[in-house]
Each structure stands twice: as C-alpha cells, then as structure tokens.
Amino acid sequence: MSQEIAVIGSPAFTTGFQLAGVRKVENVADDEKDDDLDAAVEAVLADEDVGIAVMHDDDLAHLSRGVRQSVEASVEPTFVTIGGGASGASGLRDQIKRAIGIDLMDDDDDASAADTEAGD
C-alpha cells in the first residue's frame, strides 16, 4: 500500500505543496491556529493513508502539549517540520534518525575522511 504526504498549516504554506501534487491538505488560517491546529494535526495522525506529514516549525508552538508530544513521538506518520532556520539539516537528520531508528549520515563522516586521506 502506498502512503501519501500530508501538509498542515496556513494556506500560504500549503499552496506550494498542493501545486507540487500533495492532495492531503489541512488548511488552518494563521489567526485560527490556537483554536484549530490541534484538530487538524489529530486528523492527520488518525489518517492511515498518510506516511509523512509536513508542518512549519513555528506551528508547533500553537499545539497543545499532548498533541505536540504525539507529533514528536509519531513514527507513522513521520512529521517533518520546515522553516526552523536554526535546526536546518541537523533537525531533518534527527527526524529521519527517529523515524527509522538509525543515523544514515553517520558513515558519511568516516567516508569523507577516508577520501581526504586517499587524496593526500
């Protein structure tokens, strides 16, 4: 069974994903996030067809503690947050590591060191 990507957030955030072909979208206006974002996230968590859920990093602050903990602990769907700035690639690396249980980038550091030594 093929799983889908879902995106949750403001219409300004979700529009690009829709243009790219994402069909599962939960739009929550910026001024309604404190009231409605929990329900949108819970709907995605309950949807068995969703394998990856995308949110803006800033939207995590609008979630209640319980829903935020569910997002952080969720393996399926795996939640990916975008736009945090400071976390960047390391944040995505941590999310992938949490989702699959291993650090895929761990060997890359060793391989690049070996390549550098081989070139000397």
From Swiss-Prot:
Compartments (UniProt record): Cell membrane
Write down the superkingdom of origin: Archaea
List, in alphabetical order, the Gene Ontology terms for molecular function in this entry. ATP binding; proton-transporting ATP synthase activity, rotational mechanism; proton-transporting ATPase activity, rotational mechanism
For this UniProt record, the keywords arranged alphabetically read as follows: ATP synthesis, Cell membrane, Hydrogen ion transport, Ion transport, Membrane, Transport
Q: Name one GO biological process term.
A: proton motive force-driven plasma membrane ATP synthesis
What is the role of this chain? Component of the A-type ATP synthase that produces ATP from ADP in the presence of a proton gradient across the membrane.
Which protein, by its recorded name, is this? Answer: A-type ATP synthase subunit F
